Structure formats: structure tokens, C-alpha cells
């Protein structure tokens, strides 16, 4: 199949001149040419979401541009890459497209929000959280596309937009990027970003001071509201009641609602069913931990922003060691730069590796090394460690092994489960969470983990 078509290339060039940069980069550029026969132009979108959005929002625009180039009417149809056979797409070209897409940062052609505009909109937005600073990867492409769609057309299809994902994966960044985008397009837009904790405190304050009218005006008379960490509504009955009516008032007035949580609506506990139902009535988009390629792109972009030159092998080393979230990844980058600056040591893997703690083993280790060291330390056999034994000494050793493997290798949760005798990824996740909790409350566990880390460091440095 021909994947580079001169007509589609010309159409893209034309659209690049007429559409905003974020719109073009997010929707038009990723679309791949499939075929052009008898006036029918077939395009392949990366996923069903993109295909549907293109069909609803850009079909006529593309058809008009194609008609101007071809000199006759052109009908455009869209297919989803996920719904067609893998052999119908040139995979090499598609992979290149995805790699390029990951490293592009999208935003308006204008500059960041100016202090003047911010003074007009006391919205609580962080200047750093804009689309152009967000690195898009397979883990976040859907959430990014949905966020941009809402920023471009608020109060329409995706209302509310519910963004969910673990800590430090970019939920707040995307939420606030929506707010910045709206303020740039319309400086008079009333945008409000607030954490659930702040909303709760405002409600409590309003009750105490008999000022609920002012609180309701504050939250209900906005064009766009961004509510972070909605899971903290759990158990707060009166606050839930107030938020329920606030949600209804905003939705009925056509205001856009964006909500972020560490889990999807159907997994929230201690929250009224009627609220969960409303959270689910729009679009839910999750963000997963970034893959190695995306983590590398994030570090490269951060190095560019900080005007730092880091060796490629060091960037890859950091990207390989910090796998759970972006916050940890960027924190490791900052510590590495600070360490090299203070000590005067060169920016190399050998010099930086030992200080990349506390959540990283700090050296290159293999799954076999982790299992061997944990087995030796706790004096349990390797076979018993990877078995299904629930004896407390074995179970505790296994949990620590899973924790160390998570933070000492770039293996995914399912892969770690495989290393421990085919355990389910949820079992691995639970084990890691248990160790993380105990590290701050149980000195004995903390000491055991640190001693095994030290043993792994000693072994690994022999190979540096």
C-alpha cells in the first residue's frame, strides 16, 4: 500500500497553514494515507477516538482542502488503525510517525500566559503546565487528545472530561494546560483550577461564616472548572452534596467540567452513586506510566529546557531506572545535575548511579540478581521465593523482592510477576505498595531493603 501520497501531502500542507498548530499536530499530522480511488480519500487514524474526532470535526475542512487541490469533489472517510489488520499499514512508516509524535510538544502559537492575563484570571494555574511542555507518548495520547479537544471545544461532547491515572503521571499538567489554552484564546474566560481539598475547605468556611452564597458564586459562575484529586471527596457527605449541585449547575449552563482522580469513576469508594454516574457521563481518559522511549523523550526535553547537555547513555540509564512516574523521573534528573555540579564529577553513569536513591537501587541489576540476593538475605530457597507459599517469612521476602525488582529494573508489573513464578500484576502492585508503606513506618523493613540494595550495588559496580 502506498503510504506517502502527493495529494494527501499537499492537503496536509494546506491545512497546516489554516489550522492552529496544536490542532494540526494532534489530529491531522498523525493521520496516514490509505488509498485514493474514484474521488474517495481514505485515511487511517491512530485509534478509534482520533478517527471519530476527525470525522465529526475535520471532515468538511479536509474535503474542502482536497477539492481545491484536485479540482473536483473529494469525499473523505476515516478508518482506525486499531480496527484494521496490521498488514494493511506500512508498520515502519507508522512507527516513525509515532516516535516523531512522542517528541512533539503542542501548544498555541502564542507565548505562555502573560502576567497581565493571569491577573485578570486569578485561576490558580501553574505557568509551567502548558501543552507545549507535555511530552506525548502511547501512555498518554488518548488523554492528551481528549484534553486538547476540550480546550478547543469546551462544553460539548466530553463534558465532563475525567482524567485518571497514578501519582505523577501528568494529570494536573493536562488539566491546567486546558485552562491556559482557554485563557489564551479568550482572556475574558472565567477559568478556575482547584483541588478537592481546597473546595472542601471553602465549603467548610462558607458554612461557618454563613457565606455559602459567595462560595457558590465562586464555583458556579465559571466557564471552565478544573477539579483535581476528586477521590478525596470520599466520606465527605456535605461536600459531596454541595459538589453535586455545583456540577449540575455548571453542566446545565454549558460550562466545561474537567475532573482528575487516581482511579476511574467506577473504582471510587465512599462517594455517592449519583456523583459517580455524573463523572461517567462524559469522557474518561486514563494515563499510564510512560514506556522507556517516552521517558527518554521526557528527559531529553527537560535537558533542552534546562539548557543542560547530558550524555545519551546517562539519559537512557535514568530513564531505565525510574519507571513508575514522571515526577520521580524528573526528580532523578534534577538530583543528577545537582550532584555533578556540587561534586565536580563528570556526568557519567558510573559517577551518578550510586546517588540515584531513595526509590532506585541505583545500579543496573537483573531479575536474577534480585532474586538471588533476596533469597540469600532471607535464607529462603529460590524455588520457595517464587512459589505460592504464604508463610510470612517467604511472603515478606517475596514482596521486598518485587519492590526491588520494580525499582532496580525496567520490567513491567506483568514481567515482574512472571519472574516470581507467574504472579498476577495486581499481586505485584499490592506487594510494592505494602513495602512502600512499611518503609516509612517499620525501621526493620527499611533496614532490610537498604542492606539488600547495598549488596546489589556492590555486585553491580564490579561490572561497571
UniProtKB/Swiss-Prot annotation:
Molecular function terms, GO-annotated: ATP binding; ATP hydrolysis activity; DNA replication origin binding; lipid binding
Pfam families referenced in this protein's UniProt entry, alphabetically: Bac_DnaA, Bac_DnaA_C, DnaA_N
Region Domain IV, binds dsDNA: start-end pairs: 341-464
PROSITE patterns: DNAA
Domain III, AAA+ region, as annotated region: 124-340
Subcellular location: Cytoplasm
Listed InterPro entries: AAA+_ATPase, Chromosome_initiator_DnaA, Chromosome_initiator_DnaA-like, Chromosome_initiator_DnaA_CS, DnaA_C, DnaA_dom, DnaA_N_dom, DnaA_N_sf
Highest taxon of the lineage: Bacteria
GO terms for cellular component: cytoplasm; plasma membrane
Main location: cytoplasm
Residues covered by region (Domain I, interacts with DnaA modulators): 1-79
Listed transmembrane segments: none
UniProt keywords, alphabetically: ATP-binding, Cytoplasm, DNA replication, DNA-binding, Lipid-binding, Nucleotide-binding
Region named Domain II: 79-123
GO biological process per UniProt: DNA replication initiation; regulation of DNA replication
Function noted in UniProt: Plays an essential role in the initiation and regulation of chromosomal replication. ATP-DnaA binds to the origin of replication (oriC) to initiate formation of the DNA replication initiation complex once per cell cycle. Binds the DnaA box (a 9 base pair repeat at the origin) and separates the double-stranded (ds)DNA. Forms a right-handed helical filament on oriC DNA; dsDNA binds to the exterior of the filament while single-stranded (ss)DNA is stabiized in the filament's interior.
Subunit structure: Oligomerizes as a right-handed, spiral filament on DNA at oriC.
Family assignment from sequence similarity: Belongs to the DnaA family.
PANTHER family on file: CHROMOSOMAL REPLICATION INITIATOR PROTEIN DNAA (PTHR30050:SF2)
Free-text note on domains in this protein's UniProt record: Domain I is involved in oligomerization and binding regulators, domain II is flexibile and of varying length in different bacteria, domain III forms the AAA+ region, while domain IV binds dsDNA.
Protein name in the entry: Chromosomal replication initiator protein DnaA
